[in-house]
């Protein structure tokens, strides 16, 4: 269980894709967070997310699993907890529905929630000299590798916990 949210920081509300019901969901969440004394900021682009994440004590994504996957690597790199509001159909990874936003805001204010640490995949491209070439990338669930040129062999090493 986590302690109360840091009042000097804000809850980042991440809305990267226009979805039906998004505007209403953001309005409800901002109202509920304000009722509980928590500040918030709406983040609508990946560039804005990279700038805002340092001010956020928590990120709440609005969309579905795709939005969660998009945001997860940056959240993990900054050690910022992530919750998801399902605006789509399935939302296996999301935390709650729009109807549950008042409960989510209350839980954030009270610190009455648990975090589930997920294993992340780290992708590192190595140069011919054996030195890592920046940037390293984090991913949740899966990684796709694509050859730069067709007809060439790909040399791939995979490690799990250094083995």
Spell out what each predicted region is.
Residues 1-58, 62, 99-114, 125-137:
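ATP/NTP phosphate-donor binding region
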Residues 25-27, 72-75, 95-97:
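Short amphipathic alpha-helical segments
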Residues 27-32, 76-77, 160-161:
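Short, solvent-exposed amphipathic alpha-helical segments in soluble enzyme
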Residues 30, 72, 155:
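Short glycine-/small-residue-rich flexible loop motifs, especially phosphate/cofactor-binding loops
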Residues 66-71:
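Short glycine/serine/threonine-rich phosphate/pyrophosphate-binding segments
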Residues 79-81:
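Proline-centered loop/turn at the N-terminus of a beta-strand
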Residues 86:
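Divalent-cation-assisted or electrostatically stabilized phosphate/pyrophosphate-binding catalytic cores
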Residues 90-163:
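Catalytic core of DAGKc-family lipid kinases
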